[in-house]
Regions:
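The feature marks the mature, well-folded catalytic cores of soluble enzymes
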Residues: 2-279, 285-359
Length: 359
């Protein structure tokens, strides 16, 4: 939110129930901080294959620092540094990026890497893989490319019923950012259709996605309206919006920022009573703060926390090694970016702070 932008408080909201956990997950934290390190370590431009995370404000913040987002690695000039997004990339994309000769950082979420590994192992053992995922979503596209001849993407029960009669064993895997509701019915239909289906010992569904959905379900029945903060191309954000509607909340609004809240003709926020607020896993906390300021609840804000999240994903190894080398050179008086600090600070500094420091 720009400092010069003033959001008119409403005075008509009684109170806000603020879901927790909300906002950045561990994978998004890692990816944003990794790209921040690259911006600080390299002379621009730094390139990024796809949006680093699915959030308009985050992408705009990096674009302001000269990061160039591309949807084809062929658009990256040879020798330029490039980051691959948190959603995971097809093996041929990783190979092409590497062959272009620049420094390549793969910021894929470790939970997505787990699914890629499962696909590779099951395909190698001769399984047909039923993969529950959204058509065209970058995570699904990258995962399916790991073993395109073995994997069959489905999104609903009808697509499960339309699958062929496999002669080989069947495995069931999923896009990590699905809602449990999206996954459960399709998984049940797959198990009914293929009773001997193999499933991983630990669910493919992201714990952060599940936590945010559970936190929303804790507050939604008590709310007159729910505001979900996040971008329309964020799968987990859209799932939160749909979940709030399924919970029976009549007024559900997905907004990129406070400026998009519904307004009365006089410009005031057109919400009343108790308003629930949550944010998708790619939405920075500054957007939440701006929405709370705009709602200005007379009875204050009550944070409803269902669990704590302390998971930490460190930067990719080659980036850690680069930053360590820069630190050592700087300590010897041999140059290097003065703003770069030791990687031991990475865990302590939240992505929102790292992102804000770029401004």
């Amino acid at each position: 939110m720009n400092d010069e932008t003033t959001i008119e408080p409403t005075g008509s909201v009684d109170r806000v129930l603020l879901a927790a956990p909300r906002g950045f997950c561990a994978g998004v934290e890692m990816a944003i901080k990794a790209l921040t390190w690259m911006v600080r370590a390299f002379d621009g431009p730094v390139y990024c294959y796809h949006e680093i995370v699915h959030n308009q404000r985050v992408v705009e913040r990096f674009e302001a620092q000269g990061v160039v987002f591309v949807d084809d690695v062929a658009d990256v000039p040879p020798g330029r540094p490039v980051m691959l997004s948190a959603h995971g990339s097809a093996p041929e994309v990783v190979l092409e990026a590497t062959e272009r000769g620049g420094f390549v950082v793969d910021a894929v979420c470790p939970l997505v890497t787990k699914v890629h590994h499962e696909v590779k192992v099951r395909a190698g053992k001769g399984y047909s893989i039923v993969y529950i995922g959204h058509d065209g979503h970058e995570e699904a596209v990258g995962t399916m490319a790991v073993a395109p001849d073995a994997i069959h993407r489905v999104e609903d029960v009808a697509e499960v019923e339309a699958l062929p009669e496999f002669t080989e064993p069947v495995a069931l895997l999923a896009q990590t950012t699905l809602s449990h509701r999206d996954w459960a019915d399709v998984a049940a239909a797959t198990t009914e259709r293929f009773p001997d289906v193999w499933t991983p010992g630990r669910s493919d569904l992201c714990f952060a996605t599940t936590n945010r959905q559970a936190a929303l379900m804790e507050i939604a029945p008590r709310c007159d309206a729910v505001v979900v903060i996040g971008s329309s191309n964020s799968s987990n954000t859209v799932a939160l919006e749909r979940l709030a509607r399924d919970a029976g909340c009549d007024q559900v609004f997905r907004v990129n920022a406070a400026e998009e809240l519904p307004r009365d003709v006089d410009g005031r926020v057109a919400l009343r009573g108790t308003v629930g607020v949550t944010a998708g896993a790619s939405a920075p906390e500054e957007l939440v703060d701006a929405v709370l300021d705009a709602l200005a609840p007379a009875g204050g804000v009550e944070e409803v926390r269902i669990t704590d999240e302390d998971e930490y994903f460190p930067p990719p190894r080659n980036l850690r090694d680069l930053i360590t080398a820069i630190d050592r050179l700087a300590s010897l008086g041999l140059g290097g970016p003065g703003s770069a600090s030791t990687t031991t600070t990475d865990r302590a500094v939240p992505a929102s702070s790292a992102l804000g420091a770029l401004s």
